[in-house]
């Protein structure tokens, strides 16, 4: 048994409404493509995001910034007909075995991630734009990171397909001219999209360590 006593951030994801997809095989391929994009962008992952069983995916990060960045990038990288829900759990973890799906892990980080994704699903019944929740300890005290996630998810949930693609492109370092060529629109139109929410999202990503705080 290999116990990791360092503080980690475990991420569990689940495709939203996957049974409504015309082709589950195509949906799974779109998910894998999105995860490849995210893993290239957030290359510091201790365990890159990867599909596990059914419609779930998992990953492990050393700090909260990268964990939360990865979750929003998955949403931006998926086709506009797909979305993903996430639970982020903080704590230690341990390797308890291995299977054809990879290492079998357990521990507080994973328990918290499971609680977090269940909470996100429950809260989305009255907060339909919510897609991400974090659990960092066993107390019931409110976590400022969840206040941030509520607003971030609501913003991204209101994006159309083009806004998601442009936002992803900005994170990847593309210029507005490049994005205009990609989308077949003017640079001015890209700038308008940027002012209509994308800029706020990018700024919030840059300030994640300050906004989210907590142990790293």
Spans of features found by a protein language model:
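Regulatory and interdomain segments flanking nucleotide-handling catalytic cores
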Residues: 1-216
